[in-house]
């Protein structure tokens, strides 16, 4: 018992460790002979080569089943979301306020519009084509250069008085501001049967404070009638249409009451667009609050 309980010295432990690392009597290194180390190394090398090959084969088969022209992620919404420019968000959604007599209060809003429309200049649309059919532009083949599909031009001048070309202030200076409305893209989405979807902007009453004897909102739409031409649909995806630009509709609000906050809703009217989803306030429509001080 005394021998078993005897503690080994540091030199004894180091000697045993060196003997384990290399045993000159048996020719073993770390408990195995060099030949066995070679065989076990070859076994693991072969094992991981086979596993890597199987993994690569699985990835290859998976990639062959994926359509490169279909987005990796798609929303579950059947109707496109709608966005507004300029977009200034308050605590509860879009809230825009400015003073007609103070240029600094609306300079940032017009800068947002100019920056947004920079992608709709003729130079930026030079790879797109002119479309005038007013019908759905179906493309079964990839006839455009680099195995892509054609995209229709949409330039800022199509927004006429709301293009920022003739009036750089977009009507904000005179209290008749322009707002640009855009539908989000959905691959192969057809908004209606045979009629172009259009924008309809109206005052939205507060259920708790209904307004009385108020005239309807007067709006000038650009392009005329506030329509999104059908030849911009369907959209085939970013890879198939790398030069695609969303069509736009500008709404110039003509009779917004001054010095008070009003709620405005702009809806997309089309056969296949819904705007009554209580879970998504931006599906098929956009709501915002506007205050014009004078």
From Swiss-Prot:
Compartments in which it is found: Apical cell membrane; Cell membrane
UniProtKB keywords: Cell adhesion, Cell membrane, Disulfide bond, Glycoprotein, Hydrogen ion transport, Ion transport, Membrane, Potassium, Potassium transport, Signal-anchor, Transmembrane, Transmembrane helix, Transport
Disulfide bonds: 131-152, 162-178, 201-266
Broad class of the protein's primary localization: membrane
Membrane topology type: Single-pass type II membrane protein
Region feature immunoglobulin-like, mapped onto this chain: 194-294
Segments on the Extracellular side according to the record's topology features: 58-294
Transmembrane segments: 37-57
Glycosylation sites: 99, 103, 130, 146, 161, 193, 225
GO molecular function terms listed in the Swiss-Prot or TrEMBL record: heterocyclic compound binding; P-type potassium:proton transporter activity
Complexes and interactors: The ATPase pump is composed of two subunits: alpha (catalytic) and beta (regulatory). Interacts with alpha subunit ATP12A; this interaction is required for the formation of a functionally active pump and targeting at the plasma membrane. Interacts (via N-terminus) with alpha subunit ATP4A (via the P-domain).
Family: Belongs to the X(+)/potassium ATPases subunit beta family.
Name by which UniProt lists this protein: Potassium-transporting ATPase subunit beta
Gene: Atp4b
């Amino acid at each position: 018992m005394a021998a078993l309980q005897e503690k080994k010295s540091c030199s004894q432990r180091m000697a045993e460790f060196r003997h384990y690392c290399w045993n000159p009597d048996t020719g073993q290194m770390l408990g195995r002979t060099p030949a066995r180390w070679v065989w076990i190394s070859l076994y693991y090398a072969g094992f991981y080569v086979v596993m890597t090959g199987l993994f690569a084969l699985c990835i290859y088969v998976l990639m062959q089943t994926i359509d490169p022209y279909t987005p990796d992620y798609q929303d579950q919404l059947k109707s496109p979301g709608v966005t507004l420019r300029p977009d200034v968000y308050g605590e509860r959604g879009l809230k825009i306020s400015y003073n007609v007599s103070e240029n600094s209060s609306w300079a940032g809003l017009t800068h947002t519009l100019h920056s947004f429309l920079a992608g709709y200049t003729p130079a930026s649309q030079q790879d797109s084509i002119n479309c005038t059919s007013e019908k759905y532009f179906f493309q079964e083949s990839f006839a455009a250069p680099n195995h892509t599909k054609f995209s229709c031009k949409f330039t800022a001048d199509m927004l006429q008085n709301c293009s920022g070309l003739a009036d750089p202030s977009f009507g904000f200076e005179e209290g008749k501001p322009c707002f640009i409305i855009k539908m989000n893209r959905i691959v192969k989405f057809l908004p209606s049967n045979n009629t172009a979807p259009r924008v309809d902007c109206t005052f939205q009453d507060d259920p708790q404070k209904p307004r009385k004897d108020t005239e309807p909102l007067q709006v000038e739409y650009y392009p005329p009638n506030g329509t999104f031409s059908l030849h911009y649909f369907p959209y085939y995806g970013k890879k198939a249409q790398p030069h695609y630009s969303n069509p736009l509709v500008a709404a110039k609000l003509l009779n917004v009451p001054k010095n008070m906050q009003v709620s405005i809703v702009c809806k997309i009217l089309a056969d296949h667009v819904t705007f009554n989803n209580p879970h998504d306030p931006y599906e098929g429509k956009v709501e915002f609050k506007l205050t014009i001080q004078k």
